[in-house]
Regions:
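Acidic/polar-rich alpha-helix caps and helix-coil junctions
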Residues: 1, 9-219
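Extracellular glycan-interaction surfaces
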Residues: 5
């Protein structure tokens, strides 16, 4: 496993990683009906988001520019295209070009390149196949675009959104010490994902205009 986890403290807040005390109010899955209303001064998973949270945040609105598209996205988009083209046509050079693009992101983050990291992995050959690089670039997208509204669409176009119906794990928020807090704990919420959710429903206002439009399955 590459050491990308070293970036975790910079994007996520957790016990022993806090820099200052701020009292905030939380809501826990109120939109899903699991527990409506405020839940007090705690987080259900033991984690808090740190990325995009302004250092001056004090429970009031803070305005600052939000990137619509970043250079990192263009690099990873092109890398993904090259990997899929190689899988279809099995040509030379595309995988190396894709790795070079991904490495731009990794080097900027201060972590080893793909080849350097996977030399120490259990399956070093993974970085030299289209199938292996596909998994690598998808993982890079998940980490690089954390909370940037990419994951929702990525999982659907990859047809991997079924993982959204799997169990969710967090820390033991009732733990009083590091030993009892840092224990993987299954959250008591039920998530489901249906095949129909790969497509959006066509608004009734549109189907009423054109009766011949066939509604997407499941809606």
């Amino acid at each position: 496993r590459p050491p990308r986890s070293t970036l975790f403290p910079y994007t996520t807040l957790f016990r022993s990683n806090a820099k200052k005390a701020i009292v905030v109010k939380f809501r826990k899955n109120d939109a899903n009906g699991w527990e409506d209303g405020q839940t007090g001064n705690y987080t259900g998973t033991g984690y808090l988001n740190k990325k995009f949270v302004h250092p001056a945040f004090q429970n009031g609105p803070v305005h600052y520019p939000y990137p619509v598209i970043r250079m990192a996205e263009m690099y990873l988009n092109l890398a993904e295209i090259l990997i899929e083209l190689d899988a279809l046509e099995n040509t030379t050079g595309r995988l190396e070009e894709a790795k070079g693009l991904i490495d731009k992101i990794r080097v900027r983050a201060g972590i080893p390149t793909i080849d350097e990291a996977w030399k120490k992995a259990n399956h070093p050959e993974k970085a030299n196949t289209a199938e292996g690089l596909r998994e690598i670039v998808r993982r890079e997208r998940q980490i690089e675009f954390y909370l940037e509204n990419q994951r929702f669409w990525d999982l659907r176009r990859w047809k991997d959104a079924g993982i959204l119906g799997e169990k969710v794990w967090g820390m033991n928020i009732e733990g009083d010490t590091d030993e009892t807090f840092f224990v993987p704990t299954e959250l008591q919420n039920i998530r489901t994902f249906k095949q129909a959710q790969y497509l959006m429903p066509i608004p009734m206002t549109e189907t009423n205009k054109v009766p011949h439009i066939v509604q997407n399955p499941g809606y």
